[in-house]
Amino acid sequence: MSKSVFVGELTWKEYEARVAAGDCVLMLPVGALEQHGHHMCMNVDVLLPTAVCKRVAERIGALVMPGLQYGYKSQQKSGGGNHFPGTTSLDGATLTGTVQDIIRELARHGARRLVLMNGHYENSMFIVEGIDLALRELRYAGIQDFKVVVLSYWDFVKDPAVIQQLYPEGFLGWDIEHGGVFETSLMLALYPDLVDLDRVVDHPPATFPPYDVFPVDPARTPAPGTLSSAKTASREKGELILEVCVQGIADAIREEFPPT
């Protein structure tokens, strides 16, 4: 029998047996294909939540579904904007419908415990809408016990002491961390071959007005696409972030889905 935590690496009989046990937690990473500056690959928002899911699953005995590779449109003030070559996005209705369809299928399999791990800020409310529509559909079908936990891994990095270690020069806020120290450090810890620190563009933090304008003016986004400099990123910082996220998420899932 396969020992993999990835559903896609199991046979259907192995998967069926795990789900039939009744307390199996499934985890679904939801990412995006989005530029992350000159120094990192474009599938950061898929790679990172998938890696976190894998490590959490190994600690708690969960399974990881294949992640969603595409997400909602990159917004200028959180992801640099949807105008960059390579950034490939979904309409909100498409993402919502995909989440809804997957939940319905998992329920058909007999699963009742799901964790949706977001890796792309812009996905958030469309994931929630998909969950809401799916649970309503399941209730109409007589399924009342399907439970979903939705989270973003970065929300577990909140200890001021940890923030100080990551940003000793001062933390300017999550809203400009796209392609910055946080994501780059995690990538250095997990996928160092996909990071080239020599290509980091050291630029001042992006500044935006307290409102949005459409159509977007690309000139308001720093030229490399990152919203802050990643020059102080390091593998050590990434390892710290990873442990904080994995332990915090594992604890949260154990609390929400206690053993039966």
Swiss-Prot record:
One of its GO terms (molecular function) is creatininase activity. Creatine binds at residues 78, 121, 174-175, 178. It catalyses: creatinine + H2O = creatine. Changing residue 178 to A: Loss of activity. It is an enzyme of class 3 (hydrolase). Zn(2+) 1 binds at residues 34, 45, 120. Changing residue 154 to F: 340-fold decrease in catalytic efficiency. SUPFAM superfamilies: Creatininase. The keyword Zinc applies. It holds the Pfam family Creatininase. Its EC number is 3.5.2.10. The record marks 122 as: Coordinates a catalytic water molecule. Binds 2 Zn(2+) ions or 1 Zn(2+) and 1 Mn(2+) per subunit. The Zn(2+) in the metal 1 binding site can be replaced with Mn(2+); however, the second zinc in metal binding site 2 is much more tightly bound and cannot be replaced. The enzyme with one zinc and one manganese ion is more active than that with two zinc ions. Zn(2+) 2 binds at residues 36, 45, 183. Its cofactor is Zn(2+); Mn(2+). Retains 75% of the activity after incubation at 75 degrees Celsius for 30 minutes. Pathway: Amine and polyamine degradation; creatinine degradation. InterPro entries: Creatininase, Creatininase-like_sf, Creatininase/forma_Hydrolase. Changing residue 154 to A: Loss of activity. Optimum pH is 7-9 for the forward and reverse reactions. Homohexamer; trimer of dimers. The proposed catalytic mechanism involves two water molecules. The first molecule is a hydroxide ion that is bound as a bridge between the two metal ions and attacks the carbonyl carbon of the substrate. The second water molecule, that is bound to the carboxyl group of Glu-122 and to the metal 1, functions as a proton donor in catalysis. Cyclic amidohydrolase that catalyzes the reversible conversion of creatinine to creatine. Is also active toward glycocyamidine, though the reaction rate is very low, but it is completely inert toward hydantoin and its derivatives. Belongs to the creatininase superfamily. This is Creatinine amidohydrolase.
